């Protein structure tokens, strides 16, 4: 079952991290396995496995988990962790236990993984809030489309979708009636309201609707369903479209949500926040086998510094060019 293998990206590594932690908290000479003429100690096992990719990732996850629990643990309640766990369990239904087992997890290790992710998410969101500027709002406003009322046909087959597109675009066609009859959406829903920053439908579908005028019908929009790895096909009609106000401040609250969502999903920004937390925790690696596990975060500030330097150089170059042109103009006079 494909669904059970996608529990969480990298989730199995936390279970491995727990194994490493257990090794470190036990006497190095403690026997893990005994046999005739030999034994395998905790130290033997640790040295054999510490250089593997799984162990490297596991140690990184363990470090990040401990650091964020220390710095942000009070900001995310255990109740919220339980709620997130229960929601995930409900989504998987009867296959949840199998998904855990296939990923090498127990209920406790999965909850720890969820909590670690929630702590990082909290830290990233708070950092994003502090960096919000009017320029961010204005940029988001430029591509923002206010609420649209739409009718959406969801289909599983491209040829069928093309045929139905012809039907709904025919003169006098009743789009709503055809949509209700033909859609293959599980809940048979065809009526939607959303703005350009919404996530209730695939991004490409919302983008297509945003580009339509009131009364227009889109072409067939093909979207890969991440749950099934199969393409879904959509046809959208915009039945009502709110006029966009000229002042971005009218949408400030909504634009804030959109900007924060974009920032928190940005990998470079996430790494920057994690790097700052690791630096604050003064993480020191004692075993050289794990010397490079934080490398991706060590370069974060350098990238930011390089980007800022580049912008500064461009500004200096531009200013110098303007000064040169000004001097030339005065000389000619």
UniProtKB/Swiss-Prot annotation:
Low complexity composition-biased segments: 323-333
Molecular function as annotated in GO: peptidyl-prolyl cis-trans isomerase activity
Protein's membrane topology: Lipid-anchor
Transmembrane segments: none
GO CC entries: plasma membrane
PROSITE patterns: PPIC_PPIASE_2 (PS50198), PROKAR_LIPOPROTEIN (PS51257)
Protein name in the entry: Foldase protein PrsA
Gene: prsA
